[in-house]
Structures are given as structure tokens and as C-alpha cells.
């Protein structure tokens, strides 16, 4: 037994040798002692070993594409085409990482010489249709670091704005600066259509926030060892850098691509679609539905450079949400907006309900504003602002009903008083 002093009244840790007065807690075992600091150190070592053994993609039991799609169905309404494409692309990406982790590089070279490449994803579609939410939900299911960046803030190196390496800094921050975890994460770059080349023909003037950003993104999309400044901002020679390999980072880029449907429709013209169509018949594809028929040449004409398009082999489209889909978004997902507000009112001991007419009116307003699902919360917040101000101070309200008239502005929410037990611990009559 480790003791200090002649009287033997002071004990010390058997691992670090600190006395019981130097540590917060000393735990006794059969003939040994361990302090709280050594216990914390042991926990960190165990966590590091577990995380290093999990390098095969963040998920030991990788869900199949159908399982991934079913998970997305529980959180995201509609967009079946995008969900299927995303599920297949993500499954293949992490399956490739797992296979490379399980087979040494030397053995891979001795086998058939086939090296699996990375397939980044391009998502097209108007705002508020679920592009960002799909990527976030997929990352949450796989338990991998997720970072989101805005392409409009990026500029070519050497100009005012953010370097593309700052995207990887956000990924490192999401992984708590665990480089190994960050190297298997997912990055979503929004507003990628805003960095399209300003003109189809190359210009003699430098396009630092358009084509210049596309050029800067090429290497990290394909896979390179990037030097990331840990404090962010611009690089300078005296700064320390964190090296991160982007070979196994999955990049999902998205944008509204307003005007791309016109380019597609012009290319398609009035030619009949399909193999069995009557040669004399014609069908014109217009509007956002045309995005599903996009080809690389359409993206090039829009303003993306060929090298950038080539690094985004998986292309899918999300479509505008109609009234029916918006009503479903309000009630069906696990994290539905109505459930969120019901939970918020429940914390004050008040029951909140929405009538069918109210749900339809919220959807109609969102369609009229053209904000998609992103505008639903703003509409509910506007309607409930006065209610959320009054109700916490009133003991005579136990139920609030949101009606169609309250949404349209022709009336107000109904306050009801029924004997419902409050979370505050009292009854209201």
C-alpha cells in the first residue's frame, strides 16, 4: 500500500504518485489507490482507442440504401428522387471507406488494382425545399461530423473574403478538432449557383468570387491534403496549420440555379420524350420539373466550369413543395413544426392545437410567399407572437386553439379554460 510519512496517515496514488492532499479524490482498491486525475486520463485513452477503431466511416453497421431512405422518410416529406439518390451515394461512399480501411494498401495493389473513386453530390432546386435539411439529417443518422458553408462568402485566395480552407475548419470544429473523424465527415456547400461564371465565354478580367472559387474548390472536392488555419481567417507564413486529407470527405453542394430550367427546356425543345412516343407528338418540359433532366452541358452553359462539373458526378433535383406537401410537413415528421410549438407551450402548462383550416392557411401563405418549408416557422411565429407574450402571465388559460382566421389575420387565437393540469403544478378552472 502506497503511504507517505512516518505515521502512514497520508496515502498516494499508485499510478502518478500524488498524495491525497494534491488531488480531489483518492479511490482505494485491494492494496492500491487511484486518483481522479488518473481516472480521467484513463477515460480519455479508452475514448481515443474506441474512436480510432471506428475509422471505417463513423458507423460500424452501415445502413443499406433502403434503410437510409426510410430514415429520411421519417424526417423529410416528399423529394423521393433526391432521397433515393442521396441514400445510394452516401452508402457507396462509406462502403468504399470501410473497404479501404479493412484492406491494407499493399494488398489492394496486389489484388485487381481497382481503386474506388469518390462521388460528390450536386443538388438542384429552389430554396426551402429541403436540400440543406436532407444533408443534415443524413449526417445525423450516420453520426459523422457535418459542416455547412455558404459559397457566396468565398473568394479566391489573396482577395477579401473567406478562403475555401475555412470550410474544412468548420468541419474540424464539428469534429471537436479530431482530424480522423473530420476526414470522414460530410460538408454541405450552399448557394453554389452564385459562384457560376458571370459569362459563358472566358473573360480577361479576374472573376475572384465566381470562377475563381470554383477553381479553388477543385482540389478539396477531389481529395487533397489541405492546410487549415486553426484560428480561421487568412493564411500567413508564421501561422501553424492543421493538415486534413479530404479524400474521404463527402461534399454535397446545392443551389437554386434559377434560370437553369430555361436552358434545359431550350435544349429539349419540343422533341418527344421516351422510346415509344409518337414521332409526331411533342412535349415541352417547363419549370422546376425540368431540373430532373439536367445534363453537364446545361450546367456548363449556366456558368459552372467543366472541371467543377466533373467532380460532382451525382446530380439530383428537389422540387417545389405544393400545398399538400407543406401541410404534411407541418404535422407528419418526427420533428414537425406543430409538435415543436406544442412542446413549447406545454412547458408553460398550456395545450396548443391547430385546426385543419389553420394548417391549410399556413401552407397557402407559404406558397404565396414562395419561401417553401423554410417560411412555415415564420408564419407560425407571427401568428403566435401575441399569444406567447400573454399566456405565460395568465393563470386562466389552459388551452390555445389556432384557427384559420388567426392565420389569415381575420381573427385571433382562441383562449380556453378547462381543468387541465399545468406543468407549473396547479389546476386551472
From Swiss-Prot:
Keyword list, A-Z: ATP-binding, Chaperone, Metal-binding, Nucleotide-binding, Zinc
Keyword Nucleotide-binding (UniProt): yes
Cited SUPFAM superfamilies: Glucocorticoid receptor-like (DNA-binding domain) (SSF57716), P-loop containing nucleoside triphosphate hydrolases (SSF52540)
Gene3D superfamilies xref list: 1.10.8.60, ClpX chaperone, C4-type zinc finger domain (6.20.220.10), P-loop containing nucleotide triphosphate hydrolases (3.40.50.300)
Keyword DNA-binding in record: no
Quaternary organization: Component of the ClpX-ClpP complex. Forms a hexameric ring that, in the presence of ATP, binds to fourteen ClpP subunits assembled into a disk-like structure with a central cavity, resembling the structure of eukaryotic proteasomes.
Family under the similarity heading: Belongs to the ClpX chaperone family.
Designated name of the protein: ATP-dependent Clp protease ATP-binding subunit ClpX
Lineage: Bacteria, Bacillati, Actinomycetota, Actinomycetes, Propionibacteriales
Gene symbol of the encoding locus: clpX
Amino acid at each position: 500500500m502506497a503511504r507517505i510519512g512516518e505515521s502512514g496517515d497520508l496515502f498516494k496514488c499508485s499510478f502518478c504518485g500524488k498524495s491525497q492532499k494534491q488531488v480531489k479524490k483518492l479511490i482505494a482498491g485491494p492494496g492500491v489507490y487511484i486518483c481522479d486525475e488518473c481516472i480521467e486520463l484513463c477515460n480519455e485513452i479508452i475514448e481515443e482507442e474506441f474512436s480510432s477503431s471506428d475509422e471505417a466511416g463513423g458507423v460500424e453497421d452501415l445502413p443499406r440504401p433502403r434503410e437510409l431512405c426510410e430514415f429520411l422518410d421519417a424526417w423529410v416529406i416528399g423529394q423521393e428522387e433526391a432521397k433515393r439518390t442521396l441514400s445510394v451515394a452516401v452508402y457507396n461512399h462509406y462502403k468504399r471507406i470501410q473497404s479501404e480501411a479493412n484492406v491494407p494498401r499493399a494488398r489492394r495493389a496486389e489484388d485487381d488494382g481497382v481503386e474506388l473513386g469518390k462521388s460528390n453530390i450536386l443538388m438542384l432546386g429552389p430554396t426551402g425545399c429541403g436540400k440543406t435539411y436532407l444533408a443534415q439529417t443524413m449526417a445525423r443518422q450516420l453520426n459523422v461530423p457535418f459542416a455547412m458553408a455558404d459559397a457566396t462568402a468565398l473568394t479566391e485566395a489573396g482577395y477579401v473574403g473567406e478562403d475555401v480552407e475555412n470550410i474544412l475548419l468548420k468541419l474540424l470544429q464539428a469534429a471537436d478538432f479530431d482530424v480522423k473523424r473530420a476526414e470522414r465527415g460530410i460538408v454541405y456547400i450552399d448557394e453554389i449557383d452564385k459562384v457560376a461564371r458571370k459569362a459563358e465565354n472566358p473573360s480577361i478580367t479576374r472573376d475572384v468570387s465566381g470562377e475563381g472559387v470554383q477553381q479553388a474548390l477543385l482540389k478539396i472536392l477531389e481529395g487533397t491534403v489541405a492546410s487549415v488555419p486553426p484560428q480561421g481567417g487568412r493564411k500567413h507564413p508564421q501561422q501553424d496549420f492543421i493538415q486534413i486529407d479530404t479524400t474521404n470527405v463527402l461534399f454535397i453542394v446545392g443551389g437554386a440555379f434559377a434560370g437553369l430550367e430555361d436552358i434545359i427546356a431550350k435544349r429539349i425543345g419540343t422533341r418527344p420524350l421516351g422510346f415509344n412516343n409518337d414521332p409526331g407528338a411533342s412535349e415541352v418540359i417547363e419549370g422546376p420539373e425540368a431540373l430532373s433532366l439536367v445534363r453537364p452541358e446545361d450546367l456548363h452553359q449556366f456558368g459552372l466550369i467543366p472541371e467543377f462539373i466533373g467532380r460532382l458526378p451525382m446530380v439530383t433535383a428537389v422540387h417545389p413543395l405544393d400545398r399538400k406537401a407543406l401541410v404534411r410537413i407541418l404535422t407528419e415528421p418526427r420533428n414537425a413544426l406543430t409538435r415543436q410549438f406544442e412542446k413549447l407551450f406545454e412547458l408553460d402548462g398550456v395545450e396548443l392545437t391547430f385546426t385543419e383550416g389553420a394548417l391549410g392557411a399556413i401552407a397557402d401563405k407559404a406558397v404565396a410567399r414562395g419561401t417553401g418549408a423554410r417560411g412555415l416557422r415564420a408564419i407560425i411565429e407571427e401568428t403566435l407572437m401575441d399569444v406567447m407574450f400573454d399566456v405565460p402571465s395568465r393563470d386562466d388559460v389552459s388551452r390555445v386553439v389556432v384557427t384559420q382566421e388567426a392565420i389569415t389575420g381575420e381573427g385571433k387565437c382562441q383562449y380556453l379554460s378547462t381543468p387541465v393540469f399545468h406543468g407549473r403544478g396547479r389546476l386551472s378552472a
